[in-house]
Protein backbone atom coordinates (compact mmCIF):
# COMPACT_ATOMS: atom_id res chain seq x y z
CA UNK A 1 0.00 0.00 0.00
CA UNK A 2 1.34 3.43 -0.93
CA UNK A 3 2.01 5.84 1.90
CA UNK A 4 -0.47 8.67 2.19
CA UNK A 5 0.68 12.19 1.42
CA UNK A 6 -0.10 14.63 4.24
CA UNK A 7 -0.97 18.19 3.23
CA UNK A 8 0.32 20.71 5.77
CA UNK A 9 0.60 24.45 6.02
CA UNK A 10 4.09 25.73 6.84
CA UNK A 11 2.78 26.53 10.33
CA UNK A 12 1.50 22.97 10.73
CA UNK A 13 4.79 21.51 9.53
CA UNK A 14 6.70 23.64 12.03
CA UNK A 15 4.36 22.66 14.90
CA UNK A 16 4.67 18.95 14.13
CA UNK A 17 8.48 19.20 13.94
CA UNK A 18 8.53 21.02 17.28
CA UNK A 19 6.28 18.39 18.89
CA UNK A 20 8.46 15.57 17.54
CA UNK A 21 11.61 17.18 18.90
CA UNK A 22 9.96 17.68 22.31
CA UNK A 23 8.79 14.06 22.46
CA UNK A 24 12.15 12.64 21.38
CA UNK A 25 14.13 14.67 23.88
CA UNK A 26 12.22 16.01 26.86
CA UNK A 27 9.36 13.46 27.14
CA UNK A 28 11.56 10.42 26.53
CA UNK A 29 13.93 11.61 29.26
CA UNK A 30 11.08 12.31 31.69
CA UNK A 31 9.53 8.89 31.11
CA UNK A 32 12.88 7.09 31.40
CA UNK A 33 13.32 8.78 34.78
CA UNK A 34 9.80 7.69 35.86
CA UNK A 35 10.61 4.11 34.88
CA UNK A 36 13.91 4.24 36.77
CA UNK A 37 12.18 5.56 39.92
CA UNK A 38 9.36 3.00 39.62
CA UNK A 39 11.87 0.14 39.32
CA UNK A 40 13.24 1.24 42.66
CA UNK A 41 9.89 0.39 44.26
CA UNK A 42 10.67 -3.31 43.96
CA UNK A 43 8.55 -6.13 42.53
CA UNK A 44 7.58 -5.09 38.98
CA UNK A 45 4.68 -7.57 38.80
CA UNK A 46 2.64 -5.47 41.24
CA UNK A 47 4.11 -2.05 40.55
CA UNK A 48 1.40 0.35 39.33
CA UNK A 49 3.87 3.23 38.88
CA UNK A 50 6.04 1.07 36.63
CA UNK A 51 3.06 -0.11 34.57
CA UNK A 52 1.82 3.46 34.18
CA UNK A 53 5.24 4.72 33.09
CA UNK A 54 5.63 1.87 30.57
CA UNK A 55 2.16 2.61 29.14
CA UNK A 56 3.05 6.29 28.87
CA UNK A 57 6.29 5.32 27.14
CA UNK A 58 4.37 3.21 24.61
CA UNK A 59 1.97 6.08 23.87
CA UNK A 60 4.82 8.53 23.34
CA UNK A 61 6.66 6.10 21.05
CA UNK A 62 3.46 5.58 19.05
CA UNK A 63 3.06 9.35 18.65
CA UNK A 64 6.72 9.69 17.64
CA UNK A 65 6.26 7.01 14.96
CA UNK A 66 3.13 8.77 13.69
CA UNK A 67 4.86 12.16 13.53
CA UNK A 68 7.95 10.74 11.82
CA UNK A 69 5.75 9.13 9.16
CA UNK A 70 3.68 12.30 8.78
CA UNK A 71 6.78 14.47 8.33
CA UNK A 72 8.34 11.97 5.93
CA UNK A 73 5.26 12.18 3.70
CA UNK A 74 4.37 15.83 4.30
CA UNK A 75 3.67 18.18 1.42
CA UNK A 76 3.67 21.86 2.33
CA UNK A 77 0.80 23.78 0.78
CA UNK A 78 2.02 26.55 -1.49
CA UNK A 79 -0.12 29.61 -2.17
CA UNK A 80 -1.03 29.76 -5.84
CA UNK A 81 -1.20 33.43 -6.83
CA UNK A 82 -3.09 32.42 -9.98
CA UNK A 83 -5.92 31.14 -7.77
CA UNK A 84 -6.02 33.87 -5.14
CA UNK A 85 -9.83 34.12 -5.17
CA UNK A 86 -10.43 30.35 -5.38
CA UNK A 87 -10.83 28.16 -2.28
CA UNK A 88 -7.86 25.79 -2.06
CA UNK A 89 -6.16 23.92 0.75
CA UNK A 90 -4.59 26.63 2.90
CA UNK A 91 -7.30 29.21 2.15
CA UNK A 92 -9.31 30.88 4.88
CA UNK A 93 -12.88 31.05 3.68
CA UNK A 94 -15.86 32.89 5.12
CA UNK A 95 -19.15 31.42 4.02
CA UNK A 96 -22.77 31.77 4.92
CA UNK A 97 -24.85 28.77 5.89
CA UNK A 98 -28.00 29.78 4.02
CA UNK A 99 -30.15 27.32 5.98
CA UNK A 100 -29.21 28.94 9.31
CA UNK A 101 -28.45 32.43 7.95
CA UNK A 102 -25.13 32.21 9.83
CA UNK A 103 -21.63 33.23 8.73
CA UNK A 104 -18.67 30.96 9.50
CA UNK A 105 -14.95 31.28 8.87
CA UNK A 106 -12.56 28.33 8.58
CA UNK A 107 -9.15 27.63 7.17
CA UNK A 108 -9.12 24.61 4.86
CA UNK A 109 -6.19 22.37 5.89
CA UNK A 110 -5.03 18.79 5.49
CA UNK A 111 -6.40 16.17 7.87
CA UNK A 112 -3.29 16.21 10.09
CA UNK A 113 -3.97 19.85 11.04
CA UNK A 114 -7.74 19.71 11.24
CA UNK A 115 -9.23 21.22 14.41
CA UNK A 116 -12.74 22.64 13.90
CA UNK A 117 -12.73 24.23 17.36
CA UNK A 118 -9.63 26.21 16.32
CA UNK A 119 -11.20 27.23 13.00
CA UNK A 120 -9.44 24.63 10.82
CA UNK A 121 -11.39 22.05 8.82
CA UNK A 122 -10.04 19.21 6.73
CA UNK A 123 -10.06 19.31 2.96
CA UNK A 124 -11.47 15.77 3.23
CA UNK A 125 -14.42 16.74 5.44
CA UNK A 126 -17.81 17.12 3.72
CA UNK A 127 -17.76 20.91 4.13
CA UNK A 128 -14.10 21.21 3.16
CA UNK A 129 -14.63 19.13 0.02
CA UNK A 130 -17.72 21.12 -0.93
CA UNK A 131 -15.91 24.47 -0.61
CA UNK A 132 -12.79 23.53 -2.60
CA UNK A 133 -12.43 25.30 -5.96
CA UNK A 134 -15.31 27.70 -5.30
CA UNK A 135 -15.02 31.48 -5.73
CA UNK A 136 -16.61 34.39 -3.89
CA UNK A 137 -20.34 34.38 -4.63
CA UNK A 138 -20.49 30.66 -5.49
CA UNK A 139 -22.98 28.45 -3.68
CA UNK A 140 -22.86 24.73 -3.02
CA UNK A 141 -24.81 22.08 -1.19
CA UNK A 142 -23.22 19.74 1.30
CA UNK A 143 -24.63 16.68 2.99
CA UNK A 144 -24.14 16.83 6.76
CA UNK A 145 -25.38 14.57 9.56
CA UNK A 146 -28.18 17.13 10.07
CA UNK A 147 -29.24 17.08 6.42
CA UNK A 148 -28.35 18.97 3.25
CA UNK A 149 -27.04 22.48 3.86
CA UNK A 150 -26.54 25.26 1.31
CA UNK A 151 -23.40 27.37 1.63
CA UNK A 152 -22.42 30.64 -0.08
CA UNK A 153 -18.78 31.76 -0.26
CA UNK A 154 -18.35 35.34 1.01
CA UNK A 155 -14.56 35.82 1.16
CA UNK A 156 -11.41 33.86 0.35
CA UNK A 157 -8.00 34.70 1.84
CA UNK A 158 -4.72 32.95 1.13
CA UNK A 159 -2.16 32.01 3.74
Swiss-Prot record:
Which keywords accompany this UniProt record?
A: Coiled coil, DNA-binding, Transcription, Transcription regulation
Q: Which Gene3D superfamilies match?
A: Transcription elongation factor, GreA/GreB, C-terminal domain, Transcription elongation factor, GreA/GreB, N-terminal domain
* Coiled coil regions, renumbered to chain: 10-75
Spell out the molecular function terms from Gene Ontology: DNA binding; RNA polymerase binding
> What is the annotated role of this protein in its UniProt record?
Necessary for efficient RNA polymerase transcription elongation past template-encoded arresting sites. The arresting sites in DNA have the property of trapping a certain fraction of elongating RNA polymerases that pass through, resulting in locked ternary complexes. Cleavage of the nascent transcript by cleavage factors such as GreA or GreB allows the resumption of elongation from the new 3'terminus. GreA releases sequences of 2 to 3 nucleotides.
Q: Which family does it belong to?
A: Belongs to the GreA/GreB family.
Q: What is this protein called?
A: Transcription elongation factor GreA
Recall the taxonomic lineage recorded for the source organism. Answer: Bacteria, Bacillati, Bacillota, Tissierellia, Tissierellales
Amino acid sequence: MADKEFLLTQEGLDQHKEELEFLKTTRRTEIAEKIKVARGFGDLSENAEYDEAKNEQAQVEERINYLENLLLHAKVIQDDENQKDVVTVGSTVTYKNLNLNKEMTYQIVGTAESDPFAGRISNESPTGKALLNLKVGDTTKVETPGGIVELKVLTVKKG
